[in-house]
């Protein structure tokens, strides 16, 4: 559990840095090139978990869950897969409610996915 929580926080921090650095400085086209360059560098050093799509997910993590304290608390029970499923929910209130339910009721990521699909449909 501790490793999982640390991984979630690492991904959130990377997302925060990406958001902070790229949103303020880059146009959309430059952002894409920067993501590709950053991804190449990180994949070469640390492996495939830093491919472009993963970096985009990390950035989204910081956007959807902007408070580190909340991420830290949720990460005690939720895996990265839980967070990826929560990204499917556009409505912040619904997303927060589902995250809280996952934590309190111990939903697996599969159970969460099923409940989200019912919400979306």
Language model features with spans:
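Basic, low-complexity intrinsically disordered segments
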Residues: 1-121
């Amino acid at each position: 559990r501790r490793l999982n929580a640390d991984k979630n926080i690492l991904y959130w921090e990377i997302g925060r840095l990406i958001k902070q650095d790229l949103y303020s400085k880059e146009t959309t086209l430059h952002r894409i090139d920067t993501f590709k360059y950053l991804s190449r560098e990180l994949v070469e050093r640390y492996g495939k978990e830093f491919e472009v799509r993963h970096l985009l997910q990390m950035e989204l993590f910081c956007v959807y869950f902007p408070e580190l304290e909340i991420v830290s608390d949720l990460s005690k029970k939720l895996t990265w897969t839980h967070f990826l499923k929560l990204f499917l929910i556009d409505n912040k209130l619904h997303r927060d409610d589902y995250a809280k339910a996952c934590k309190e009721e111990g939903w697996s990521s599969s159970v969460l996915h099923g409940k989200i699909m019912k919400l979306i449909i």
